[in-house]
Each structure stands twice: as structure tokens, then as C-alpha cells.
Amino acid sequence: MPVKIIALAEGALTGFTDEIFDLPHTLAARDLFIDVPGEETELLGTLAKLYKTYIIVQCKARWPEVMDDRYFNTLFVIDPQGEVVHKAAKNHLWCRERSCTPHDIYDRWVECFGEGIEAFYPVLKTDDIGNIGTICCSDGEYPEAVRALTFNGAEVVYRPSEAVPMTNSGSSPGGSWMVQNRGHAEFNSVYMLCPNVGPVYLSPSSRFPMDISGGNSHIVSYRGEIMSHSTSSNNTAVSAVIDIEGLRQFRAVNLNSNWLKDLRTELFKDMYRQPIHPKNLWLKDDPAHHNEVDDVYRSNIESLYQRGTWTRPHNSFDGARLFPEGDPGTNAQKWQDIRQMWAVWNED
């Protein structure tokens, strides 16, 4: 049986150096990351043509058509002709990620792409392998992300990678990551393609990798069933048959567990009128370092207490801070120091 979709894990193309070392955003955009399309996608396009397959990939990429000196956690699809036919940006970040998001420059993003859901969660519609939506890692912590793709027509959702402890929490293989992806599939009647990254090297010259992900790559059917799963945290492959016609028949005739058909949308329309995380944070300023972004998250938590959404614990404190007060954070010189240290660490 021919392979029609190959899905790579997050980090396979551009890694995680920016977030591990809290690099200045502009420096990382210029020094580390890529353009889509670009020379990397040309190489992948050659492979797509050779094997007559679609390739789905995550990377950190610049979007110069939107804003200079910004990079986004980017999902893209290459078709069997070797062309980039889909590109989307991650909207929800892990608290240590340094990427910009469409929400962080909301006004500019709307100016470029419009303000509909399709501007933030686009779906690639094909004649041969169904409709593909793409999110990444932390995006999948929010049920709304996959629901948005579903409303836009998605039948297959690519959600690469998650990290420890989410992949090994609880007693079941795959931890809460597996639970989330089975839930996404069941609630929305979509396939979930969920490859996880293998061991990560901090630099091209590193001798030893780190296991940050915990493995557990898997594919889930539109009924929420695990079709293929590997518990390994090494570089692995999982595979399954994606039956788009079966999914479409299920949606057409099932009156019991085809949930989207009778969603009472009017009941929920007021839930999101009041914002939680502020938009346009980095419209004028460079995306901030970890310690500054932590203060934004703490402010969001306080707002949920103030509006009565959450109840405060009996004992409460701010928690550990990333840097002591007065620490200037990471800068361009420290980045050069890090690069020199890599060379020293790996000398024979």
C-alpha cells in the first residue's frame, strides 16, 4: 500500500535552541530560523516528488510578508509535486517558548489574512487525501483549536510533539497527551496524527542528546481509538490506514456518537467575550524573555480570580521566579558565549 502522508515531529527541522537558552527573539529570527518556502522546503519537496507523497512538517520560520524580525512556530504541508500548499502558525505557546504568534500581533495578522477563524486555523482541502488541519504541541492543550479546524472542514489533524511530564503522566501510556488526542478525535470525528520528537541535541556538535519528549507517538481514529502507538522515546515511526471515505460515511449516517451535528452553539456564545490573554503583546515590542512573560501569565491568573472564574487556594504565593530581580536576562553576547561553550564541551 503506498504511503500518501508522512508527518514529521516538532523539532525535526529547526530544533528548540531558542527556548532552551531564552535567546533574544530578533537574534534567533535572523540567526537560527528559516523561510517557508526556502532551501529546506526545496529539499523536502524533492523527497515528496520522489516518493509521490504529502509531507507535513513543523519548524520555526520567519514570515517576512507579515512582519520583519519575527519568527513563528510554523506548520506546513508539501504536496507530491514538491510545492508548499499549506502554511499555518501556532497560536498557543508553552510558557518557555520564544516564538511570536498571530495573537501576539493580532491587528497586523488580521490586516494580512482577515479576522475569520480560517485566518488563524486554516485547513488544506485536497482531492485525494481529505482535508488536513495543523496545530502544534501546546495548541492541542485547548479543545477550541481542534474544534476550530473541524468547523473549517478538517478531517485529519496533525498535532506534533509534547513533552514530559504530559507524555508520561498517570498510569496509561502516553499520559495526558494521549488522553487529549483521543478526546480531540472523539469529540470532533477527526483523525489525529501525533508524532513525537526523539532525543534532542543542543547543537550540531553535541555528543549526547536529551530526552525531553517522552516518546509515545501515535495515530488516533475518528472514533477516538488508538490505531498505532510506540512507547519509545527514541526516533521511531508509527503508521495506519486513514480511511477518509469511512470518516465521511460516519459523519453522514451516525446519529449517536457524531457529536458536532447537534452542538447548541447559542449556549456558549458569551463564554469568550471577555479576553484572558492580551492580544497584540508584541505588535510593537520584541517578544520578551521568560521572566517577563511569566509576569503576563501571573496577571492572567489574577484576572481569573478577580472575575470569579477561579477560587483562590487557602495558601498562595507567586512561585519560583526564573531570574532574581535585576538580572538582565539573556542577550546577544550570551548567545555568542553559548556557541563558544558548545565547541569547548565537544573537544576531543
Can you say where each PLM-predicted feature lies in the sequence?
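Metal-dependent catalytic neighborhoods of phosphoester/phosphodiester hydrolases
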Residues: A12-A29, M67-Y71
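C-terminal beta-strand edge segments of enzyme domains
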Residues: F187-Y191, N196-D348
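N-terminal active-site segment of His-dependent metallophosphoesterases
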Residues: M1-I5, T14, Y158
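Active-site catalytic loop in hydrolytic enzyme cores
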Residues: F33, E42, T46, R62-G183, ...
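Feature marks short, surface-exposed loop/turn motifs that line or immediately flank catalytic pockets
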Residues: A12-G15, P165, G246
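Short beta-strand scaffold segments in enzyme catalytic cores
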Residues: V57-Q58, N73-V77, P122-L124, S217-I219, ...
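Short beta-strand segments at enzyme active-site cores
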Residues: P2-E10, Y54-C59, L193-C194
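CN hydrolase (nitrilase-like) catalytic-core segments centered on the catalytic cysteine
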Residues: F33-I56, N131, C136-S239, M341-E347
